[in-house]
Structure formats: structure tokens, C-alpha cells
């Protein structure tokens, strides 16, 4: 699977789109009724430390590895992952979204040397009304106020 990451990096580069950072999975902690790929702490550590990080280091040393996206507020789960010092030595940052925003401040205190991003805005049902705008403003304020250097939007289209 880690080779697939590198193939995507290569394919994007061929199209003139440089990739400078990857995360192993979007919403890796969603336990959904539809097919998904939820991760355990042990699986997260093993895949990133033993497979993805070494492969990126060898094939794309210019690409940073971030943990995430953390869409969970289970601090105990994230602490288990961060307790692996060998893994932490491979990481340059973390991505948070949804409930993950609740643990961002405490994680950032533990690892002030890393970069942090909001990997996906909460677009909800795509109402784009004033209430949704206020909610998004509060999210942007929270993420940037807690040290995130990037805020990414998710947009719902009607077609």
C-alpha cells in the first residue's frame, strides 16, 4: 500500500502538481455503516512506522509525513499512537477535523515542534446559510487559534 502513495506522488508530479505532505488516511477513525477503513492505534503505528515512513524516506524524501486525519476526540487512542517515539521521529505534523478539534490544544502542547492543519472543514448538509457561516467562523478561529497553519474547506454541491 505504501508504494501506492509513491505512485500517486509521481503521477501528480508528472501533471505539474507537487505533493509536499501526505497523511495515511482521511477520517481514519470513522466507524460507519458503509464500507470504510477504520484504524486501530496499533495499526496506525505499524503502517506509518514500518511501511509508509521508510518508503517515503527512500522514494520521496521531500514529502513530509503527517499523522491523521484525526477525526476522533479519543485522546487515549491518540496518546497510544504518540507514545511510540520511533514513530514520532518520522512525523512532521498532524491533521485534525471534526471531533479531533477537541484534543488539538493538548496534543499541540505535547508536540509544539510539529505543524498542525485542519484537514477538512465541517460542511454539514451544505446549507450555506448564516448559521453555517457562523459555525465555520468559529471553527476557523479554533483551529488557527490553536496553532494550525492551514484550514481546508469541504464543500457540498447540489449537483
Residue ranges and their predicted role:
Residues 118-159:
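Aromatic/acidic polysaccharide-binding cleft in carbohydrate-active enzymes
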Residues 1-128, 134-135:
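Active-site neighborhood of glycoside hydrolase catalytic domains
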